[in-house]
Amino acid sequence: MARTHILGFPRIGERRELKFAQEAFWRGDRTEAELRDVAAQLRRRHWQLQADRGLDTVATGDFAYYDQMLSLTALLGALPRRFGLDPARLTLTQYFELARGNREQPAMEMTKWFDTNYHYLVPELDAETTFDGGPAWFFEEADEALALGLRARPVLIGPVTYLWLSKSHVAGFDRLALLPQLLQGYRRILDQLKARGIEWVQIDEPALCLDLEPAWLDAFDTAYAALREAGPKLLLATYFDTAADHAQRAAALPVDGFHIDLVRAPEQLAAWQAALPAHAVLSLGVIDGRNIWRTDLRRVLDTLRPVQAALGERLWLAPSCSLLHVPVSLAHEVRLDVELKSWLAFATEKLDELSVLGRALNQGDAVVAEALAASDAAQASRRASRRVVNPRVQQRLAAVSAGMADRASPFAERIERQRQALQLPLLPTTTIGSFPQTAAIRQTRAAFKRGEIGALEYLERIRAEIAVAVRKQEALGLDVLVHGEAERNDMVEYFGEQLCGYGFTENGWVQSYGSRCVKPPVIYGDVYRPEPMTVDTARYAQSLTERPMKGMLTGPITMLQWSFVRDDQPRATTARQLALAIRDEVCDLEQAGIRVIQIDEPALREGLPLRRADWDAYLDWAVTAFRLSASGVQDQTQIHTHMCYAEFNDILPAIAAMDADVITIETSRSAMELLEGFGDFDYPNEIGPGVYDIHSPRVPSVQAMERLLDRACEVVPPQRLWVNPDCGLKTRGWEETEAALANMVSAARALRARLSARGATTWKRLSKPAAATAAAVPHAGNACTACATHAN
């Protein structure tokens, strides 16, 4: 009999109950007891969903009040010492302070969970870190499930993955030195679970899918030799990529079963079947835990039946990874059109699919004939739908030539024509795109969406906001202006709503971090642009000023990364379709007299595969997509791109290959350290390193920004340097925005004056160096949360 289980379930609730309870607690409108009660209700509901569908075990420990890595850090007692907290007496208020900061301490660092759009809190480790235990929440959740008569299977992030994802701020400290002490903490956890009669514990080790050095591979041997002496059976779970090259070594570990991801890496099945010990179970992740499309159940059954014949009761079935990454339920999607809805499966529907697969294998197809027929019908509907495949889009894709991804002239020639056309000063000043989204702007958009105001009144209100933004920029003395994006709710959804091939859910929320949830749009079919999207707005904004006005677009890779993407064609193909749609908009903006066009790609690095061997293939099609979107214009039209806070050094050749005339990047929090890689690489085009942090309400001084510009000029010649904030200003208020931009313009003018006075054509230090005031902080490969504004 094949067993069924899941690796984890979304914790937010089908109506985002956890989010609203968290935020009420933070405001002081709910007590800790009331928040705990909401959490307990959600856990019971989610366990019952699993039990009602006949799953053999229910996942416990997958719940977290903020983040599972933070909860594990608390469970182990490894809290950052700078907070001065007693792990054994940790309250929820203190737990949230670790994630959100307090008056004395900034929050723990947050970064992406592997290559997903979920964020985790990074443990802070050093030689004095201890793992003596913390609050009993993890065990209490297992007790809750057991008290309900359920077979609980607690879920833990494994010790090697935990160390791999941690950081130390002590130079040269080897995190693996903590492994012996960490394993003692894990053994105490497993001992307590054994005492409760727990049969199986799931230990997640997705790090086994990464490029690991020998010392880290050896750590698996050490870790599981130690944990074998503890009680419950261990299911070692891998996901997000293949672990086939480590299958032989992993199979020798003293564990009782393995989970592998057959959605991301179906080719690894043979290697694991060959390596699997005779006693071990093999859990196959056959339902996509990261996307929202219904599973082709008959195709999966064709894969599973030979495995069942070989393994019998040692075969387990599961989603590919935790269902954390998909919305909770389709039940509340009342406005989604019937056809598109029939193609989708959220977390609850994926439980149904899993149940059908288990029953088909164990009892025969006849028992689930109706469900299999519905699956067949959904697959046939997608294949046949005229909404999915558009002949004109296919013809246009086939006609794309290599030359379409190239500008007419090399950068050295283009930039001279652009300088003549734009007549900008040395160190031109600009912003990244968005300006403060005031309550009035949000109310206007909401009123229009609800039908309370008509299209004409909406347009008049938005144009009034644009006029305000233009006047403020001119008064500040900025050189290249933006319209402020008052009409945009989100940098992906705004464009997706105007592109064919996109759909939108009402309640398709997934957790990004903490209480922040995102509702990604759905790319279900061939993408194309039926009509211009931003041209009228840009033309109006340009009519208000003689200074250059930037057209503002979201790039094809960011549109791809921040959506649920169709799974019936390669992502590279969808990226090319997006690129052609954006290319049309770029060309129309140029025809409308827009001389500077920005194509934002904050998510470019996020798309990198987990293994470096796969990077080149991804970067090739991703860069080509950007170039295809940007290369239809004349030489004198200047193309900008923006990338958020990320580690760029290892992909600088790809960034240079994008061939944007100007790239703006987020650098102020690293005190311009991120810029040094561009200098070492001799980045050939123009660059605008951010000179102040838009995530903070603090207004930096003129002198502080001058110091950052001085440092930037040591890396990039002033003739190729732009002056701008780190990112868009949507989340800030006008008072702080105007003050900060005024200081930024003053800093640029002061540096211009110093350069002019010295007659400098190349940079030499013009003043005694002073330490930059922006403190360097660790950075990760993420777009900043200011860009990911489709959240709530």
UniProtKB/Swiss-Prot annotation:
One of the GO biological process terms: methionine biosynthetic process
Organism this protein belongs to: Cupriavidus necator (strain ATCC 17699 / DSM 428 / KCTC 22496 / NCIMB 10442 / H16 / Stanier 337) (Ralstonia eutropha)
Record-listed L-methionine binding positions: I432, G433, S434, E485, D600
Per the similarity annotation, which family is this?
Answer: Belongs to the vitamin-B12 independent methionine synthase family.
Q: Which InterPro entries match?
A: Cbl-indep_Met_Synth_N, Cobalamin-indep_Met_synthase, Met_Synth_C/arc, UROD/MetE-like_sf
Q: Which UniProt keywords apply?
A: Amino-acid biosynthesis, Metal-binding, Methionine biosynthesis, Methyltransferase, Repeat, Transferase, Zinc
- Pathway entry: Amino-acid biosynthesis; L-methionine biosynthesis via de novo pathway; L-methionine from L-homocysteine (MetE route): step 1/1
The protein, known as? 5-methyltetrahydropteroyltriglutamate--homocysteine methyltransferase
- Give a short account of what the protein does: Catalyzes the transfer of a methyl group from 5-methyltetrahydrofolate to homocysteine resulting in methionine formation.
Spell out the reaction equation it catalyses. Answer: 5-methyltetrahydropteroyltri-L-glutamate + L-homocysteine = tetrahydropteroyltri-L-glutamate + L-methionine
The residues the record assigns to binding Zn(2+) are: H642, C644, E666, C727
How many cofactor units bind, and how?
Answer: Binds 1 zinc ion per subunit.
| Annotated active site | H695
Q: Which residues bind L-homocysteine?
A: I432, G433, S434, E485, D600
Q: Which Pfam families match?
A: Meth_synt_1, Meth_synt_2
Q: Which coenzymes or cofactors are required?
A: Zn(2+)
EC annotation from Swiss-Prot or TrEMBL: 2.1.1.14
The gene behind this protein is: metE
Gene Ontology molecular function terms on file: 5-methyltetrahydropteroyltriglutamate-homocysteine S-methyltransferase activity; zinc ion binding
